[in-house]
């Protein structure tokens, strides 16, 4: 989860987020190596008085600085495309949850259960209990089973929203009249926080998302108590 003064990514809790974290490190290393090379070349040019004023053409150099960037782009593109296809895959979900964005709250419907739906509003700061997080707590959490593929159908009732949970590697736009989908899967139990990530009006900052991932038997008990 997130913590104060955090500079890096949140701890990965899903296979997709683990892949995204590895890809981030992979790309950042390439950027670091390129930046180091450019800095070395600039430093060398400034430190020497030697120049090549008579050089009119250097085909070998032109070949190198054409092919090398192309190879680097391929090394970035291939893992990126792999992750994009992984994020679009939804294989045999055990549960489907429909998520609707509103100004300024979320509503959830468990389509596999009859009459299991609720709205999720942010808990005002004055009503928070000790230890709860400001602007991130909700009155109704989304309870889901861990270690199982879950399909989220995401749309909006009014304006553009975006349903995002960083530690699970999720960010899907909620568009009026359009149904987007995403796969939710967690490697471990716990509370995972997110927020609306698309400017949607004056209370955009007050649309938190809380997923409570629990073992399957606890989810079955919860769903039975809600119906």
UniProtKB/Swiss-Prot annotation:
Could you give the cofactor binding note from the entry?
Answer: Binds a dinuclear copper A center per subunit.
Q: Which residues bind Cu cation A2?
A: 196, 198, 200, 204
Give the EC class as a word: translocase
One term of GO molecular function = copper ion binding
Topology, Mitochondrial matrix side: 46-59
The protein's matches in PANTHER family, at most eight in alphabetical order, are given as: CYTOCHROME C OXIDASE SUBUNIT 2, CYTOCHROME C OXIDASE, SUBUNIT II
Please state what the protein is called. Cytochrome c oxidase subunit 2
Give the species this sequence originates from: Acomys wilsoni (Wilson's spiny mouse)
Q: Which gene encodes it?
A: MT-CO2
């Amino acid at each position: 989860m997130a913590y104060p003064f955090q500079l890096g990514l949140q701890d990965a809790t899903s296979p997709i987020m683990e892949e995204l974290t590895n890809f981030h490190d992979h790309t950042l290393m390439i950027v670091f190596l390129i930046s180091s090379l450019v800095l070395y070349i600039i430093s060398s040019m400034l430190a020497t008085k030697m120049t090549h004023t008579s050089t009119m053409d250097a085909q070998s150099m032109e070949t190198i600085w054409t092919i090398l960037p192309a190879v680097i782009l391929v090394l970035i593109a291939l893992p990126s495309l792999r992750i994009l296809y992984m994020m679009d895959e939804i294989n045999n979900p055990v549960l489907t949850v429909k998520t609707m964005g509103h100004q300024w709250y979320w509503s959830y419907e468990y389509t596999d259960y009859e009459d299991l739906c609720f709205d999720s509003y942010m808990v005002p700061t004055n009503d928070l209990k000790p230890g709860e997080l400001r602007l991130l707590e909700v009155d109704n959490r989304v309870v889901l089973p861990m270690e199982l593929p879950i399909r989220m159908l995401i749309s909006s009732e009014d304006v553009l929203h975006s349903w995002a949970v960083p530690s699970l590697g999720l960010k899907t736009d909620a568009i009026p009249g359009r149904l987007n989908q995403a796969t939710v899967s967690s490697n471990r139990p716990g509370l995972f926080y997110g927020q609306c990530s698309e400017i949607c009006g004056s209370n955009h900052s007050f649309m938190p998302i809380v997923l409570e991932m629990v073992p399957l038997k606890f989810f079955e008990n919860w769903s039975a108590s809600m119906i």
